[in-house]
Swiss-Prot record:
Core component of the RAG complex, a multiprotein complex that mediates the DNA cleavage phase during V(D)J recombination. V(D)J recombination assembles a diverse repertoire of immunoglobulin and T-cell receptor genes in developing B and T lymphocytes through rearrangement of different V (variable), in some cases D (diversity), and J (joining) gene segments. This is V(D)J recombination-activating protein 2. Residues 505-517 have a biased composition (Basic residues). It is found in: Nucleus. GO terms for cellular component: DNA recombinase complex; nucleus.
């Protein structure tokens, strides 16, 4: 058991609470980056490299027949083992987008190809569902059960927005627990069925789900209706072989009071290490537990925890995911350290000694942090071919700077003024910022102060402007002065722009005869005047 600090090399801002770690073909991938994908990695999926205490990300491309996979926070995902000629992959359901929209789609992510220089290409497909489908949600779990050669998925828990009939302007962004229903998804035909069990009376989210054969064990979780983390463990059995699934549920003791925890598998058996998470809203769970699934059920025993550092102990938030082989990645925000450029500090926790076999991680559980915090074409293959290279030499050669993600290659948003410190009491932090006005989406609203040489931009929220006043100032032509320069919304009127009118002389028509000018004598004029009178 060890705890090793990691240095994120120009990629620390991409990891956020609610991200997921996937394991395919011996590699680790990051899914659910912060914000929308940028030019350097349009897929939003990165390969994770840990070497010499450094954490690096490598952009991953997708095949031509792949669908778009948005970066989802707190989705439910489960690993698919190779079965009947189908490759290994991951099923991803639900989650929140960077625009705080909640998804209800089901995606299948598999490995499409691997180039000679270890470049990985993924394939993403959206699966169509019919029947009683699970609605949009996040913070839920997706588990794989199998019996007599047939497989099915179990969806349970999560949170979602209030129903459309109850959603108003005041509670537009309020979330509620999803009804305590269990959804069974037949992967072969995409048929869904919903089941209501008397043992499941309250909705729960950010729990753990561990599966073995046709059993699924739900550990811990948080309920908004109860406002605490009740100690509970449920076992769910799904009889999937014939006809409609027969679902049964039972309660187990001892139980666990935990939410947003990480489960990493140790060895080829169904043994898991539970670490991280929260016992209360403001209290982290510093203990570790060993969970073993066998024919008799589930056994939970305490396990020695690593020597947590002072940064981990005193920080209020942590997140991460399983990296397989008895190891996990933990990240903590750099709270109260404005001088440090890193947004997060990262650690690798290993529970397996060197030399022990690394088993396949058949059940993937990633961190689903309940606290809502809220780019160039894909890199092309190198033209250099590798012949007669050793595996370790090939791995070292792929660590070049050409295919490693670097934040310095992206556009510097600080130059645009969105995340600058506009005043001494600036309240906008790019790591914890949330929309304040209804017109805000991805960046804070700003207003221009006309004082000083050239003026400067300030955040509307820091200037304590109401939304109505902000709209009027943006639509009018009045000058604004920030609180440091008088705080007057309209002191002067912007002078209207003087547009010089252009004198356009008519073009002289060519080859055109003008009207005939007839000269009339005064006698003829008098004659015509008397004639018409």
């Amino acid at each position: 058991m060890s705890l090793q600090p990691l240095t994120a090399v120009n990629c620390g801002s991409l990891l956020q609470p609610g991200c997921s770690l996937l394991q395919l073909d011996g590699d680790i991938f990051l899914f659910g980056q912060k914000g929308w994908p940028r030019r350097s990695c349009p897929t939003g999926v990165f390969g994770v490299r840990l070497k010499h205490g450094e954490l690096k990300l490598r952009p991953i491309s997708s095949s031509n027949d792949s669908c778009y996979l948005p970066p989802l926070r707190c989705p439910a995902l489960t690993r698919l083992e190779p079965h009947d000629g189908h490759p290994e992959g991951y099923l991803i359901h639900g989650g929140r987008t960077p625009n705080n929209e909640i998804s209800s789609s089901l995606y299948l992510l598999t490995l499409d190809s691997r180039g000679c220089n270890r470049k990985v290409t993924l394939r993403c497909q959206e699966r169509e569902l019919v029947g009683e489908q699970p609605g949009p949600r996040y913070g839920h779990t997706l588990s794989m059960v199998q019996s007599l050669g047939k497989r099915a998925c179990v969806v349970f828990g999560g949170r979602s927005y209030m129903p459309a009939g109850e959603r108003t302007t005041e509670n537009w962004n309020s979330v509620v627990d999803c009804p305590p229903q269990v959804f069974i998804i037949d992967l072969e035909f995409g048929c869904c069925s919903a089941h209501t069990l008397p043992e499941l009376t309250d909705g729960q989210s950010f729990h753990l789900a561990l599966a073995r054969d046709d059993y699924v064990y739900f550990l811990g979780g948080q309920s908004l209706s109860l406002d605490f983390r009740p100690p509970r463990v449920y076992s769910l059995r799904d009889g999937v072989p014939e006809g409609k699934p027969a679902v049964s549920c039972s309660t187990w003791t001892p139980s666990m009071s935990i939410s947003s925890a990480i489960a990493t598998r140790v060895g080829p058996s169904h043994e898991f290490i539970i670490l991280g998470g929260y016992q209360l809203e403001t209290q982290k769970r510093m203990e570790c537990s060993s969970v073993v699934l066998d024919d008799s059920g589930i056994n939970i025993e305490p396990r020695e925890a690593p020597e947590w550092t002072g940064e981990i102990k005193h920080n209020h938030t942590w997140f991460g995911g399983s990296m397989g082989g008895g190891s996990a990645l933990i990240g903590i925000p750099s709270e109260g350290r404005q001088a440090t450029p890193e947004a997060h500090y990262f650690y690798q926790v290993c529970f397996q000694k060197e030399g022990e076999g690394k088993g396949e991680d058949g059940n993937q559980v990633c961190s689903q942090e309940s606290t809502d915090f809220e780019d160039s074409a894909p890199l092309e293959d190198s033209e250099e071919l590798y012949f007669g290279r050793e595996p370790h030499e090939l791995e070292d050669s792929s660590e070049g700077e050409g295919d490693t993600y670097n934040e310095e290659d992206e556009e510097d948003e600080s130059q645009t003024g969105y995340w600058v410190k506009c005043c001494l009491g600036c309240q906008v932090d790019p790591n914890t910022w949330e929309p304040y006005y209804s017109t805000e989406l991805l960046r804070p609203a700003m207003i221009y102060c006309s004082k000083g040489e050239g003026g400067h931009w300030v955040h509307a929220q820091c200037m304590e402007l109401t939304e109505g006043l902000l709209v009027r100032l943006s639509q009018g032509n009045g000058k604004y002065f920030c609180l440091d320069h008088g705080g007057l919304p309209r002191q002067e009127m912007t002078p209207p722009r003087q547009v010089l009118s252009l004198k356009r002389s008519p073009m002289k028509p060519q080859h055109r005869k003008g009207p005939m000018m007839r000269r009339m004598t005064p006698a003829k004029k008098r004659f015509f005047r008397r004639l018409f009178e």
